[in-house]
């Protein structure tokens, strides 16, 4: 985008990047909004590994590697470390942590078995109200800062009516909300609702 790539819209994994795009003159002022709120999950490709006890998983002798996105680069990594701190489990992952450059690489570590478990985005392993494979536990949202994912209309799309309509669809459409919910995104929910719905 900084180098002039012909993109009309940016859908970011955080709120900072769209705000920065506007501040640097690449995004249209007044257009950033939160299109989704990400959820953090402790997930394993092993269908029997993860129950509802994060400490038991991380302290398990069977868990030699725990994948986490680099907290300096990825909001989900930052959320994972906040969760560990909130639960007093920082020492449980010492010597076990495998850092991914982004949440996609972190997911691949776990999916391929290079890490027995990992903190990833719920949307990576969840569809239509259930885990697609493996086992997971949705981390209660009160253990980490909300992962707001913002969208922004870029300057190159300022006169693109299709781009504006798409952003309006994301922001206002019940259909867009249903799609987000099906993949584990949405607006902030209470801990009780998350536990009842996803666990």
Indicate residue ranges for each PLM-predicted region:
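Periplasmic-binding protein-like
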Residues: 7-12
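Active-site phosphate-binding/coordination module
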Residues: 30
């Amino acid at each position: 985008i900084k180098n002039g790539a012909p993109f009309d819209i940016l859908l970011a994994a955080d709120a900072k990047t769209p705000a920065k795009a506007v501040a640097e003159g690449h995004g249209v002022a007044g257009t950033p909004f939160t299109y989704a709120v990400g959820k953090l999950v402790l997930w394993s490709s092993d269908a029997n590994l993860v129950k509802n006890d994060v400490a038991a998983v991380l302290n398990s002798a069977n868990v030699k590697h725990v994948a986490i996105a680099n907290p300096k680069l990825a909001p989900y990594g930052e959320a994972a470390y906040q969760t560990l701190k909130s639960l007093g489990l920082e020492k449980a992952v010492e010597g076990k942590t495998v850092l991914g450059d982004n949440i996609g690489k972190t997911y691949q570590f776990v999916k391929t078995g290079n890490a027995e478990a990992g903190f990833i985005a719920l949307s990576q392993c969840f569809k239509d109200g259930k885990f697609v494979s493996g086992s997971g536990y949705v981390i209660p949202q009160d253990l980490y800062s909300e992962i707001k994912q913002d969208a922004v209309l870029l300057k190159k799309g300022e006169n693109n009516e299709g781009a504006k309509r798409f952003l309006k669809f994301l922001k206002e459409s019940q259909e867009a909300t249903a799609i987000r919910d099906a993949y584990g995104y949405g607006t902030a929910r209470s801990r009780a609702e998350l536990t009842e719905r996803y666990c």
